[in-house]
Each structure stands twice: as C-alpha cells, then as structure tokens.
Design a protein with these regions (language model features):
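DNA-recognition alpha helix
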Residues: 43-52
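DNA-binding patch around the recognition helix
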Residues: 1-5, 61-90
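DNA-recognition element of transcription regulators
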Residues: 22-31, 54-73
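Ca2+-coordinating acidic residues in Ca2+-binding motifs
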Residues: 43, 60, 99
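Short capping segments at the starts of secondary-structure elements
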Residues: 32-44
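Intrinsically disordered, charged and Pro/Gly-enriched terminal/linker segments
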Residues: 17-21, 25-27, 35, 52-56, ...
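Short, Lys/Arg-enriched N-terminal segment that forms or immediately precedes the first helix
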Residues: 6-18
Length: 148
C-alpha cells in the first residue's frame, strides 16, 4: 500500500517503508497527480518545466515518470493516451488529502498542505501549491466553525 501524507510535512511510504525520490520534481508530480488524478502531458510540462522548450520538457517528464515507476516498483501513473497521464486505480493508496476532501475526515488535516515543500524554478507549481493550500485551509476553518 502507498501511504502519502500531504496535510502537514509531506511523506511517502510504500508497504511501511519510507520512499525517497531523487529529485523534488518527482515528489511534486506524485503530489499533483494524487490531487488531480489525471492531467495532460502539456499541463505537467507547463507546471514543472515551464522554462524549458517543449522537447526538453517532454524528455524531463518522461524521465520523471520513469523515476516514479522505478522508485515505486510499478506503474503508479499510466498513460492510456499519448497526451494523458492518469493515476493507476489498481494501486491501493491511503492519502490524508483524500480522507479530508472526499471522506470528510476532519482529523486528517494536521497542518498546511505540503508544509515546507518547494520546487526551485517551478513558479506554476508554486502558484498551484499556494492556491491549493489556501483552499484546504479555508475548508478546514469552515469545518472548525461548524463544530463550534
């Protein structure tokens, strides 16, 4: 089982063993895909390699997808169409983000979304991260107010 913590300092474990990716963009791709579930290759390139030309961005994305596959030991992300990347629904994933947003588990929120996580020179990712962090914090505060 893949366990991913995103609602505090992020962490990833696979069958209880901590997972460490060799570069931050691999972590970022995993986190983004867990939130979005599917994205076009162009969207991912624009998000993580916005300063690269298209060919270099595509090469970097392929390399990062391979790195995720190698590190996780399987196809967590699939590309059913040449232009699309999706999370493989056959994987068993426990993620605090899903518990909070989809299952309404108030206790899953233990801190800011991807607290302390950053990717150098990925301004689009940073913007997405800030928007998502703010949205989740507002949801948390709203639920907290409902309990009062």
């Amino acid at each position: 089982m893949l366990n991913v913590t995103m609602l505090q300092t992020p962490s990833v474990t696979l069958d209880g063993v901590p997972v460490s990716f060799p570069f931050k963009r691999a972590d970022a791709l995993l986190y983004y895909m867990l939130v979005r579930r599917s994205a076009t290759r162009q969207e991912l390139i624009s998000l993580l390699w916005e300063s690269c030309d298209e060919a270099t961005g595509l090469k970097n994305l392929r390399n990062t997808l391979y790195t995720l596959k190698k590190t996780l030991g399987g196809d967590f992300l699939l590309s059913p169409q040449k232009s699309l990347v999706v999370v493989n629904s056959a994987w068993e994933v426990d993620c605090d983000y899903d518990r909070f947003t989809q299952q309404g588990d108030f206790s899953a929120y233990r801190g800011p979304f991807l607290q302390g996580f950053a990717v150098k020179h990925a301004f689009s990712f940073d913007e997405w991260l800030d928007r998502t962090r703010e949205k989740l914090h507002e949801q948390y505060l709203g639920r907290l107010a409902q309990q009062a």
